Amino acid sequence: MDFALTPDQEAVREGVVALCSGFDDAYWHGCDKAHEFPHAFHKAIAEAGYLGICIPEEYGGSGLGIHDAAIMMEAISGSGAGMTGASAIHMNIFGLNPVVVFGTEEQKARFLPPLVRGEEKACFGVTEPTTGLDTTRLKTRAVRKGDKYIVDGQKVWISTAQVADRILLLARTTPLDQVSKPTEGLSLFYTKLDRDRARVVEIDKMGRAGVDSNEIFFEGYEVPAEDRIGEEGKGFRYILHGMNPERVLIGAEAIGLGRAALARAAGYAKERVVFGRPIGQNQGVQHPLAADWMALEAAWLMVQNAAWRYDQDLDCAAQANAGKYLAAEAGLKACQNAIMTHGGFGYAREYHVERYMREAMIPWIAPVSPNLILCHIAERVLGLPKSY
């Protein structure tokens, strides 16, 4: 067992840290305040070749694994970019895995290089307002008519849909009452997102204002049949290939954010003098921060375990879910304690930790709630009866 990073992983981390040093907290504060997508950051990441970290080399990528990507995303978030920086590229890192695995050679050649070069941005169109995590009950329909599909329905919580050029869209092509089991009859498409034909409405939310979240309304939206990924009706199985990597990356991002908050808290505790001594000399300040460090380190080990298992083609569902759970809990707690360490100043935007905490809610809630992760572990690992 070797816990050391490989030379390639060290190079990835060092390169990303160096790149992110050009985007300080003032930059991310500005994106958040102006509700402005970090285009300059996205461009820099693309030009450095990091958008294609997991894309096969024959399509312009680096052909590295999810473990490498997790190291990159932790470094991005930990630079102070938080979920704004991570979410700006998150979908591009893991989201097209179904295209890589199940797409035709023509589709891969058409779709992947523009994404790697940063010429196109993608969003993930699965969640719906009335189904939540019950993906098999999606109501968005795609009906085949000749060489195209006609899509009608609604999606919600679709990140980057204000700037995305394409959408990975899951829709029902066979009605639920006509399939033998609910997981059948869903089809996956990777197609252009035309905001002149689909209505995209931004959601005003708590944090990460620099990366938009949206509702999308499709009405008679035409999708070329050549944009369907794999077989009709098999989309649910295809989309599963992206779920464990997403949990790994979300976990890595939560850890980076928690570490950024912890670093600011420790720095402030050393400098802030009250009653003639640094507040960091008090155990009441020290101990929560020390506990945060331990929790973040432990969660990072679980996230890396899940990433390694995925890259080795081993089952990693339990580890990916556990890693996401532990990382989100540790990251959120570190952000809360960073605010408490700063006292009243922690509530002020200029100290940045309040932005970190608002963003830390994202990996805690999404893409799967901590409650359902506990249900998954109870059922799939411990063999307990399904509770829902």
Regions flagged by a language model, labelled:
Residues 1-80, 89, 102-107, 114-119, ...:
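Alpha-helical interface subdomain recognition
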Residues 92-102:
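Helix-loop "lid/cap" segments that line or gate small-molecule binding pockets
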Residues 118-126, 170:
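A short, Trp-centered hydrophobic/proline-enriched beta-strand micro-motif
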Residues 137, 194-222:
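Flexible, small-/acidic-enriched active-site or ligand-binding loops
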Residues 220-238:
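Long, acidic (Asp/Glu-rich), low-complexity accessory segments flanking structured domains
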